[in-house]
Amino acid sequence: MKLLSVLSLSLVLSCTTLSAQKVYEISAFGLKANSSKNASPVLQKALAKIKAEYKEGEKVILRFPEGRYEFHEKGAAVREYYISNHDQTNPKKVGIALEDMKNLTLDGQGSEFVFHGRMLPVSLLRSENCLLKNFSIDFENPHIAQVKIVENDPQDGIVFEPAPWVDYRIAKDSIFEAYGEGWTMRHSWGIAFDGDTKHLVYNTSDIGCPTKGASEVAPRRIHAPGWKDARLVPGTVVAMRGWGRPTPGIFLSHDVNTTIENVKVHYAEGMGLLAQLCENITLEKFGVCLKGDADPRYFTTQADATHFSGCKGKIVSCNGLYEGMMDDAINVHGTYLKVVKRVDDRTLVGRYMHGQSWGFEWGCPGDEVQFIRSNTMELVGKQNKIISIRPYDKEQTEGAREFLITFQEPVDQVINEQSGFGIENLTWTPEVLFSGNVIRNNRARGSLFSTPRKTIVENNLFDHTSGAAILLCGDCNGWFETGACRHVIIRKNRFVNALTNLFQFTNAVISIYPEIPDLKGQQQYFHGGPEGGIVIEDNEFETFDAPILYAKSVDGLVFRNNTIKLNTEYKPFHPNRNRFWLERVTNVTIAE
């Protein structure tokens, strides 16, 4: 009887466990893998059913049989999203709009999600304990046009060959333009890749791509007589691009405890992943990458691979592959509001200043804040707390640029609209672990961190990042991206031939470069402090050039037990000829 009771109890527990998990097969909604059927309206229907049937505490799985799925603008979810560090153009067409979900797993089982036109592939908003895994995101016809240089004559210009998937035409005004489903692009700039190695071409940075006067001299061969650049030898591959970034591949907002596992973004017209105002994000084997060594493409995303704006908790990014993107592999920061009005001793109006970062929530009652003088990047007054906050220039937060904020304690009298101050939200700042990743063959920088909480960067390979491999920034003047780094550990990484090109803030392989207009007038230090400062140890640098470390306005900097190996793979060219260049840095230890 006792054994029977145990068995009965086990059966009850098993059934309870099973009943608390509900599986939805996308095929049950009439969507089959490897068909030409538009998946967008099917996903709308499936997600509506999941939300309608959800019971509190239930775990839900939405599963795709392995294969290829096509998503088009027609029938997609239409949303007004304001996305940090992107163009604030609305509405947006969303292929998979996951909103107000709990305990949801979306399992692609190795599927390819292919998008057409101009879409936001996946969004996850206001959700808790969700897992996205085992799928890839790509576009059938990317907005970046990949071309190969066929001929280069100093007097006669360049002949180039668009990649087979590029749809193009010569417009009436004789300019080369690419086009696709609902879009047309004229590419003003480009990034040059070595045709054999896929490294960015040495000392080219952003190149102009003037195609005025273009003509087709043979099938899929375009002569651009005004495009003259001796660095682009035949065989060079150019990713022709613009500066727009309408949507990321994956958009996360107001989520708690999100995990993304074994997901690959092969192309997005903005960033690979953008997360804002989220708490606790884990990326495991996430990639913004090509489809293997045989992939004929050289590029991935139009901007950063991953970007975290105004998040808190812990950001964990491990064992990922980031390559071919047009900006950083990871960027972690908050956003300064500029003080544009002092209403009374406890009330200020703060404004989003950058043209690609506005329209979304900035803070909540109870959040801790501090104030920074823009020209010297020094803290003024004491930390304070938000009592109330509401949009000032609009009735609702969505689309707002300005906020009326009342604080718990009186605000220092010097902080007003004339004196140039920013407000930093300290509550929405994350701890970061960036470990075991490969970053290679990308434009600009390898990684960028601007958070006061503990940041560990370890066991990564930075391979031909073209600009600085690691940047610690902070800027209340241009990008308005917070903030100071108080405790950073950079250890056991390998850096291979970074700085083959020059980009913003790239003074050395590791560049600690806050934007400080009046450095001479600064009395405090921006980065570092009693929390632990910045420690760079047990790393290996393989380089052809001089600059290894640049630091500005740091209190507490340690560089020890690192190995520097010189090679002759490129000719030294960087204007910074110093191995270590320190400006206003104190409490320093340098021991190679």
From Swiss-Prot:
Membrane topology qualifier:
Lipid-anchor
- Positions with an attached lipid (S-diacylglycerol cysteine) read 15
Q: Please give the catalytic activity noted in the UniProt record.
A: Hydrolysis of terminal, non-reducing branched (1->3)-alpha-D-galactosidic residues, producing free D-galactose; Hydrolysis of terminal, non-reducing linear (1->3)-alpha-D-galactosidic residues, producing free D-galactose; Hydrolysis of terminal, non-reducing alpha-D-galactose residues in alpha-D-galactosides, including galactose oligosaccharides, galactomannans and galactolipids
Q: Has the keyword Glycosyltransferase been applied to this entry?
A: no
From which residue to which does the signal peptide run? 1-14
- Tell me the superkingdom of the source: Bacteria
Primary location class: membrane
EC number(s) reported in the record:
3.2.1.n1, 3.2.1.n2, 3.2.1.22
Q: State the GO CC annotations.
A: plasma membrane
The residues bearing each PbH1 repeat, given as ranges, are: 429-451, 452-474, 485-538
Lipid-binding residues (covalent, N-palmitoyl cysteine):
15
Family according to the record: Belongs to the glycosyl hydrolase 110 family. B subfamily.
Q: What does this protein do?
A: Alpha-galactosidase. Removes both branched alpha-1,3-linked galactose residues of blood group B antigens and linear alpha-1,3-linked galactose structures.
Q: What is this protein called?
A: Alpha-1,3-galactosidase B
